[in-house]
Amino acid sequence: MNSAALIETITQLISPLITAQGLKLWGIELINIPQPIIKIFVDTIETNRLHENNIINSKSEQITIEQCASLSRLIGLTLEVEELFPNKWTLEVSSPGLERSFFTIQQLSNYINHDIDVTLKEQHPLWPNRKKFYGTLISITDNTFMLNLSLAHRKSDEPENVSINWQQVRKATLVHHFFQPNKKLGSTKGLNGGTT
């Protein structure tokens, strides 16, 4: 069974357990070396509601250590019974965190106007030698999304916006900016001496 099929099987097995706890499955990550590590990311319904309404802060309802521990026991027992992994494996259950990774393009829809850090599987077809992009998410379609790149994250002669197909993405992560009361916004120095 390949990784994608394995993740789909695990999703079907554990989603009812997570929903029964009043939580939501955010994503699953598999690491196969040197032994399988199954990372399960779960979120609270309240946190998802706040994100849907563009309210993102560190004071929103957080999943507790007790909830993660309880789910870890339930999920661990389920995976043992199903015998999906023939050898020793490790299970980790946690919140996605403020700087969360995205597992589907649909998850991006709640984060318009937020900064995203993206690594591609290979060089972007229109940006030679570029696999990494950091910018503000400005739009999403069915299969693509667009980032606005400040001068701090591009050369002055490069386009401001980059369109990325989700199938190209190796990893996409939300960038959380912690509030700094004495820092003036919009004063990041650009590569060519300008400010953004």
Swiss-Prot record:
Keywords: Cytoplasm, Ribosome biogenesis
Family: Belongs to the RimP family.
Function in brief: Required for maturation of 30S ribosomal subunits.
Protein name as annotated: Ribosome maturation factor RimP
Protein encoded by which gene: rimP
Compartments, record wording: Cytoplasm
Record bears the keyword Oxidoreductase: no
Pfam families given in the database record: RimP_N
Lineage: Bacteria, Pseudomonadati, Thermodesulfobacteriota, Desulfovibrionia, Desulfovibrionales
GO process annotations (BP): ribosomal small subunit assembly; translation
GO terms for cellular component: cytosol
Superkingdom of origin: Bacteria
InterPro entries attached to this UniProt entry: Ribosome_maturation_RimP (IPR003728), RimP_C (IPR028998), RimP_C_sf (IPR036847), RimP_N (IPR028989), RimP_N_sf (IPR035956)
